[in-house]
Design a protein with these regions (language model features):
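Short, well-ordered coil/turn segments that N-cap beta-strands
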Residues: 10-12, 40-42, 73-79, 181-185
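Carboxylate/His-rich catalytic cores and anion/metal-binding grooves
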Residues: 185-202
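Acidic/aromatic-lined carbohydrate-recognition and catalytic surfaces
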Residues: 47-166, 177
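Conserved, mostly hydrophobic/aromatic
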Residues: 18, 36, 72, 187
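Acidic (Asp/Glu)-rich catalytic clusters
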Residues: 6-8, 33-40
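Conserved, charged catalytic cores of large soluble enzymes
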Residues: 9-13, 23, 40-51
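N-terminal carbohydrate-binding accessory modules
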Residues: 1-12, 27
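Short, acidic/polar
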Residues: 23-36, 165, 169-176
């Protein structure tokens, strides 16, 4: 008992919340994982984060996840994979697959000539004298420009939701299935979550 207290199993040790950003390299990945082990960690969450320059969820990203899993297996750390959060979207999501704003608008305003968003909007529902409308992300008049930062998936579309599950879950299973149940402890995601800059309602 005393010996186990001095050197506990990895399930009793901490899990590092590893924010993966910038350009990942194989050597840096291996070094950081060895540092986790050296500092007494029992595992880590490999979390995609703001500033990531590697091609998530592309071939280079998958290669580097495999490097992580190989090194973690070698040193005895447990890994938690994190797909991109839902409904925040995924790197390949298109303007057509995302929502920008969901809004309740009076019919009088929506049907007036001054309501500029009408031509970029779809009416989702009608209640008495109001519409529930969605404005598509990235739709601006020709003379205006703006920055599109993320957005959220159109969860009203089953096909888009299935695409998210395919890219973020099923593809990971197919690619790394030999590690699930041993090195890969679980998959974690803070879903559902819409980032504050992309809340789809006023």
């Amino acid at each position: 008992m005393l010996e186990q207290f001095k050197n506990p199993d990895r399930i009793y040790k901490g899990t590092d919340f590893w924010m993966l950003n910038d350009e990942l390299t194989d050597d840096e990945i291996r070094w950081q994982i060895r540092e986790f082990k050296d500092k007494g960690m029992g595992g880590f969450i490999a979390r995609t984060y703001v500033g990531l320059r590697t091609d998530y969820p592309g071939p280079k990203w998958k290669h580097q996840i495999r490097v992580m899993l190989e090194e973690a297996t070698k040193v005895g750390l447990r890994v938690t994979l994190q797909p991109l959060r839902m409904p925040g979207g995924f790197k390949e999501s298109t303007v057509e697959e995302t929502l920008d704003i969901i809004e309740c608008v009076s019919k009088e305003i929506f049907e007036s000539e001054d309501y500029r968003q009408a031509e970029y909007s779809t009416i989702l529902a009608e209640y008495d004298d109001h519409y529930i409308v969605v404005h598509k992300a990235g739709c601006l008049p020709d003379e205006e420009t703006g920055i599109r930062y993320g957005g959220c998936l159109n969860m009203f579309d089953p096909e888009i939701c299935r695409k998210y599950v395919q890219i973020c879950y099923e593809d990971n299973w197919e690619e790394f299935r030999e590690y699930f149940g041993n090195t890969i402890h679980t998959m974690w995601v803070d879903e559902p979550l819409v980032p504050m800059h992309a809340i789809p309602y006023p």
